[in-house]
Amino acid sequence: MKLDRNVTSLATAKSRNDHAAFTVTLALKPGCEEEFLDLLTPVLDAMRHETTFINAVLHQDPQDPTRFMIYETWADLEDVVEVQMHREYRKAYWDRLPSLLREPRQIQTWTPVRQDFTFLAGW
């Protein structure tokens, strides 16, 4: 699956040390939620071991269980575009995703300005 043109062009304009955050919004065909999660879970599990990975949070719309949003932060935008998106562990997800979507996914790229976290037991 191809990256959004804005993500690719932004990567060429940034230095290798700039952090980047992405939001990816996906609207699935009804009944595809379980398959989507089965394909995405190993990708998220593998991503956490990448050296430029900072964090990822998967969200599900409480009003529409077929809508998901992934928030990712990476230490190096160019690495995401040139290396991470082409990792073998993403292949099954990329290959199957188009048939699960009811509309094109929406990708936005952000530059983190501030990060505040509290880590709660049980989350």
Regions found by a protein language model. Give the residues of each.
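Short acidic/polar alpha-helix capping motifs at helix-coil junctions
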Residues: N6-L10, D18-F22, E33, V57-Q60
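Short, solvent-exposed alpha-helical surface patches in well-structured domains
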Residues: E35-D38, E82
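Acidic/histidine-enriched, glycine/proline-rich intrinsically disordered or flexible terminal extensions
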Residues: K2-S15, W110-W123
